[in-house]
């Protein structure tokens, strides 16, 4: 072997190539988030307002989709009832991997002021949540900031991550 050649087999392969591919995939995923708009209550009004031209989520690569099979991000906005929990879990399971969840508003985060027998006390009891947005009802700027935080989180993760499925706990 010549002096200017590097023995990659002795060093464990080509980490530069894998790192570059990983960063490329992370960049593509973080800049093309297709969100499932899943509004359940008052926070859905703010989520709809975020789709207006004033906030322009398209410039960040976020496009709202109606089908879970075409979405990577589920934005749950509003109060989740126990009857609706199974349907929410089914929608989450229909989303392709990798998938992320944003819980928007106090009702989605903790059940809000409705501590009744029919309300789920937080979406994280049904599906794993990546970003929590506090407030009642949070402004569209807050949702925009949460999507930017999710983009940063995606860039830090490995491009080939997979989550283990969780059981439905009510």
Curated annotation (Swiss-Prot):
- In Gene Ontology terms, what is one molecular function of this protein? quinone binding
| One annotated Gene Ontology cellular component of this protein | respiratory chain complex I
Q: Which GO terms describe its biological process?
A: aerobic respiration; electron transport coupled proton transport
Q: Which superkingdom is the protein from?
A: Bacteria
Regarding the membrane, this protein is recorded as: Peripheral membrane protein
The free-text cofactor remark is: Binds 1 [4Fe-4S] cluster.
State the InterPro entries in the record: NADH_UbQ_OxRdtase-like_20kDa (IPR006137), NADH_UQ_OxRdtase_20Kd_su (IPR006138)
Protein's UniProt keywords contain Metal-binding? yes
Q: Does the keyword Transport apply?
A: yes
- Family the entry assigns: Belongs to the complex I 20 kDa subunit family.
Q: Which NCBIfam families match?
A: nuoB_fam (TIGR01957), PRK06411.1 (NF005012)
Q: Do you know which HAMAP family this protein is assigned to?
A: NDH1_NuoB (MF_01356)
Protein name per the record: NADH-quinone oxidoreductase subunit B
Provide the taxonomic classification: Bacteria, Pseudomonadati, Campylobacterota, Epsilonproteobacteria, Campylobacterales
């Amino acid at each position: 072997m010549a002096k200017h050649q590097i023995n990659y087999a002795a060093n464990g392969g080509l980490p530069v190539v894998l790192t570059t591919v990983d960063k490329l995939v992370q960049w593509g995923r973080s800049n093309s988030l297709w969100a499932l708009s899943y509004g359940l209550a008052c926070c859905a009004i703010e989520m709809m307002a975020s789709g207006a031209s004033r906030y322009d989520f398209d410039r960040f690569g976020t496009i709202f989709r109606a089908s879970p099979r075409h979405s990577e991000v589920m934005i749950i906005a509003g109060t989740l009832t126990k009857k609706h929990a199974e349907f929410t879990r089914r929608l989450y399971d229909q989303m392709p991997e990798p998938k992320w969840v944003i819980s928007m508003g106090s009702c989605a985060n903790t059940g809000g002021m409705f501590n009744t027998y029919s309300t789920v006390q937080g979406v994280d009891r049904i599906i794993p949540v990546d970003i929590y947005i506090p407030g009642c009802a949070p402004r569209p700027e807050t949702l925009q900031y949460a999507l930017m935080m999710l983009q940063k989180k995606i860039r830090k993760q490995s491009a080939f991550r997979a989550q283990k499925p969780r059981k439905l706990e009510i």
